[in-house]
Amino acid sequence: SLTNPPGGGIAPTGGYIVGRKELVELCAYRLNAPGLGKELGCTLETPRDMYLGFYYAPGVVCEAIKTAIYAQCLLELVGKKPIPRYCEDHNDIVTCFDAGTAEALIGFCQGIQAASPVDSYAAPEPSPEPGYTDEVIMASGSFTQGSTIELSCDGPLREPYTCYLQGGLNFAASRAGVLLAVQNAYFKD
């Protein structure tokens, strides 16, 4: 969602606990300290990074939306039907599209990884993942592991080979990633 990345790609930790009040309280006691709960939590000596993340978050979300719109335009040019389309309202940073073949999905994800600032040398391969019935491929060369605001993509290896693309800390680098991914998926020869 557009309110998802309050850390702006800078905060080294974060997360959400949701549920019934008494269960959230139990989680807070378990994750922080008994008796302190959510009132006083661990900050890992990083409040500066968290505040800076809050400060940068609106701009980072704009970069991710620009990346999504750019990707949607480019995908339409190569005959794909992204959801949402570039001309539609955006209430999320995720773009999904049917890659068409397993090779195209793998190529797209490998292109995103190759253009990433971290672990660009790695070539993701489909593998079994807990909770999925099919193999899944994931690409994310992120500064913060598990970050959803940094450029990443993934998808299950089954027809119609739907790819989920999201994020982008800055448009310039993300545009290069999307270009390389499309080239790798559809213009490899």
Identify the role of each PLM range:
Residues 3-104, 185-189:
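Active-site C-terminal subdomain of aminotransferase-like
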Residues 77-87, 91-188:
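Conserved C-terminal alpha-helix-loop-beta "cap" of PLP-dependent enzymes
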